[in-house]
Amino acid sequence: MFATIYVPNFYLQAALRHQPELNGEAVALIDDQETKAVIMQLNPAAAIAGVRCGMTPTQGLARYLQLIVKTRLREQEKVLDELLLHFACTLAPYVEATGPGVCTVQFTDARSVLQNVERVIEQLAQASVTAQAGIAHTPDTSFLAAHLAQSVLQVDDAKNFLAPLPIETLAQV
């Protein structure tokens, strides 16, 4: 049994984690170390305002003048990744830092997996981190479930879970 814990908009969450005054504001994130800085992540308020990933900050501001443009904070990203890994390691001894904002946990004992993963998601929420998780028999299915979860999604039958999904879903993860 595997669980994947996923932090959506990881870079944006890292940049905004200690700025609760920006909750509800339209915020976009750029990587200022790129040759041409474009918006790489944005929050729902910015999306509703018509801002899209791939736009330049100027284009985003043309869509919504009150858009707040932030730059990546790599030190905060490192701290957030360490926090995620810390909580993931409370679940089982076999944990992989799969990518930025993603940890995969392998369970040798399937008892109380759902309750324990829900506990970790709640602990992350208390630390001002929005996370979601997927639980399944394979790491790939748990990864996909985590991306589609509202909070925690347990997949007992991978075939029935995957069958209705459009192929575009796989391209988005």
Question: Over which residues does each language-model region extend?
Answer:
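Residues that scaffold, gate, or flank divalent-cation-dependent active/transport sites
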Residues: 1-104, 109-111, 115-121, 125-126, ...
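Short, conserved secondary-structure transition motifs
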Residues: 135-149
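Compact, charge-rich alpha-helical regulatory domains located at protein termini
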Residues: 146-173
